[in-house]
């Protein structure tokens, strides 16, 4: 997945969201490429990893002191994610006529994953997180 860089006027929330999204992509790529957990490395696996990291960042943002600011940051993060989905699917060769259908299906998958993600923020040896990972496999 490749981050789109926007050339429009950016506000504080957009700047924070862009920096966080860059971190999400960097950590996701590092996790995907530095581990041998995955038999195959394709777009689906990349989507799942980015989704998990994005959900964790959204959760962390909700714990921050300035909740009003970080709610807007989360909105910007989701906008960046959807734009990135669109761009990366186009790069895969999906045409303009069907791109909306694919983006919509991936966004639905992401929101489903949010609803099933464990409530506990400590994911180490967390049984519900292990069940979540089995669910998305």
Predicted regions: what they are:
Residues 1-49, 59-137:
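Surface/interface-facing alpha-helical segments and adjacent flexible terminal/loop regions used
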Residues 54-56:
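Generic transmembrane alpha-helix motif of multi-pass integral membrane proteins
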């Amino acid at each position: 997945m490749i981050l789109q860089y926007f050339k429009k006027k950016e506000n504080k929330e957009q700047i924070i969201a862009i920096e966080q999204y860059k971190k999400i992509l960097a950590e996701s790529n590092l996790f995907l490429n530095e581990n041998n957990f995955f038999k195959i490395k394709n777009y689906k696996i990349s989507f799942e990893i980015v989704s998990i990291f994005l959900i964790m960042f959204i959760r962390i943002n909700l714990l921050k002191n300035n909740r009003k600011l970080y709610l807007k940051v989360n909105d910007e993060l989701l906008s960046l994610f959807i734009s990135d989905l669109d761009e990366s699917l186009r790069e895969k060769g999906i045409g303009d006529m069907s791109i909306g259908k694919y983006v919509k299906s991936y966004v639905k998958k992401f929101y489903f994953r949010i609803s099933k993600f464990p409530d506990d923020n400590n994911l180490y040896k967390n049984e519900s997180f292990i069940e979540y990972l089995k669910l998305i496999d």
